[in-house]
């Protein structure tokens, strides 16, 4: 093989027996690629010569890797950019190397090494005996004279300090100012950057594996594992926890809260969003109180006659309940009489935009069709829910509330698409009116089914009832089962398909069995 040629900044391939420009055995200069047969040094003695190679050649020597089980953990700050950490899991050996191939230290762990990460002042090791913190910035090198008269460096062994006795650590993550340890039983422990002080500790209702990932986004800590995505606050409070499909791929969490996972051939996306439930402005106006047993309003303090009270402003975020006469008390008749102790001043409610249920349902349907629901969604949802849950109260205020309009309200409530609307519809599945029940099933079809079995069990109660023979009702139930089979997790999807298959071959009318069979065939295609 060739020697190091003079005049070149990057060394060429050197002789395996020595590291000088001329061979010590023959003293001849060889060319690149030539083999020196006169060299008396064997390959087994090459390691002895290479130990004393000049430092200029060590920076081109690759990092020593004994097996494929070695893993490298990158440094977590600028103070440890001049070092790399390698660990050998099966043997339980941890070694600390510099980027120039110089061994800084070694540690023999009791048991196998489960996880390892670097810190600004050293590294943290997770073994079968717990978590260990090792400081490498305080190690001093002392010169030692060898027999050949050459100076070599003798390194002091690092002293590990146990910071936790919990033995099931599966992953370690180091950020700029925090060290996070994940355990197999769902425990999460956070320490400072050096691993000296514990910041918080909590146990989540899940399990972690070695495929877990961690990311710090602003003041939030985002954790992801197989079929699991979690968001924690900087203080350790649980903010978001969702179970995803069982998949070998770890979910991806983006900066805007979007979680993407792969389940089979399906790519799923979830987004953690915040909905505006209510916003009620407070105005500086006189106080009112309601007289029990009467719908009249008594004024506490009358406005001065020279300065009449200004009409209250209406906000687009106000709920329809507060301004719609369909849901408010009827306007009392004008009366100028006086009571024995005080004079009552009667006021009427301002006219609302939806005086009848038809106008309300038409407005919600138009907003959904045009896609401009916006901040009116809480008001729409409350009005539709009140129309469903308080039929007697609604009929007393407006006799035009019928079963068909209540069914349409249930369908529109499910079309709004929020998860909390699904729970409201599931509570109303005990309705005895088939028309309203059909509307509730249509609303569930357009709403999210979630990851639990509540919706599927509720559909079972409808399809397996003794009097479940109405064609329109069973068609709506089949549509809901098909929607559950398309959007629910795999276990719930299989149960929904099995229920559709049972309906297609059960004791139902021919039209219902044919409709269920068509849905199953469309899903199979």
From Swiss-Prot:
It comes from the Bacteria. Coiled coil: none annotated. Residues 139-158, 330-356 are annotated as: Disordered. Residues 139-149, 336-349 have a biased composition (Polar residues). This is Uncharacterized protein TP_0487. It comes from Treponema pallidum (strain Nichols).
């Amino acid at each position: 093989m060739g020697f190091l040629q003079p005049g070149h900044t990057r060394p060429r391939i050197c002789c395996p027996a020595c590291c000088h420009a001329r061979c010590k055995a023959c003293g001849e200069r060889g060319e690149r690629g030539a083999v020196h047969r006169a060299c008396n040094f064997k390959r087994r003695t090459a390691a002895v010569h290479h130990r004393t190679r000049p430092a200029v050649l060590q920076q081109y020597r690759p990092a020593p890797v004994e097996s494929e089980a070695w893993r490298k953990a990158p440094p977590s700050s600028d103070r440890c950019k001049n070092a790399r950490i390698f660990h050998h899991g099966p043997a339980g050996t941890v070694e600390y190397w510099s980027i120039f191939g110089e061994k800084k230290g070694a540690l023999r762990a009791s048991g196998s090494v489960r996880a390892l990460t670097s810190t600004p002042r050293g590294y943290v090791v997770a073994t079968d005996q717990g978590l260990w913190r090792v400081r490498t910035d305080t190690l001093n090198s002392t010169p030692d004279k060898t027999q050949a008269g050459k100076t070599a460096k003798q390194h002091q062994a690092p002293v590990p300090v146990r910071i936790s006795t919990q033995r099931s650590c599966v992953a370690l993550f180091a950020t700029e100012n925090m060290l996070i340890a994940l355990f197999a039983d769902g425990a999460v422990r956070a320490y400072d950057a050096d691993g000296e002080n514990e910041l918080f500790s909590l146990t989540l209702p899940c399990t972690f594996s070695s495929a877990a990932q961690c990311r710090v986004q602003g003041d939030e800590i985002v954790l992801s594992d197989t079929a699991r995505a979690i968001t924690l606050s900087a203080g350790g409070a649980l903010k978001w926890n969702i179970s995803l499909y069982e998949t070998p791929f770890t979910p991806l969490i983006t900066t805007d809260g979007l979680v993407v996972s792969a389940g089979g051939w399906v790519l799923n996306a979830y987004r953690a969003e915040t909905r505006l439930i209510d916003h009620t402005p407070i105005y500086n106006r006189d106080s009112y109180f309601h007289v029990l047993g009467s719908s009249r309003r008594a004024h506490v303090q009358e406005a001065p006659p020279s300065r009449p009270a200004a009409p209250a402003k209406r906000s687009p975020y106000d709920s329809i309940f507060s301004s719609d006469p369909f849901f408010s008390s009827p306007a009392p008749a004008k009366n100028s009489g006086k009571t024995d102790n005080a004079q009552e001043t009667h006021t009427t409610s301002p006219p609302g935009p939806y005086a009848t249920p038809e106008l309300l349902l038409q407005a919600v349907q138009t907003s959904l069709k045009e896609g401009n629901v916006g901040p009116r969604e809480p008001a729409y949802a409350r009005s539709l829910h009140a129309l469903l849950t308080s039929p007697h109260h609604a009929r007393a205020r407006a006799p035009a509330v019928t079963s068909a309009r209540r069914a349409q309200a249930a369908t529109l409530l499910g079309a709004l698409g929020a998860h909390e609307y699904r729970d409201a519809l599931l509570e109303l599945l005990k309705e005895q009116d088939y028309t309203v029940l059909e509307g509730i099933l249509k609303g569930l079809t357009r709403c999210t089914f979630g990851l639990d079995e509540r919706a599927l069990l509720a559909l079972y109660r409808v399809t397996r009832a003794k009097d479940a023979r109405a064609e329109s009702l069973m068609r709506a139930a089949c549509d809901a089962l098909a929607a559950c089979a398309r959007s629910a997790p795999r276990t719930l999807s299989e149960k929904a398909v099995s229920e559709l298959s049972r309906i297609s071959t059960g004791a139902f009318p021919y039209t219902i069995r044919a409709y269920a069979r068509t849905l199953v065939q469309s899903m199979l295609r």
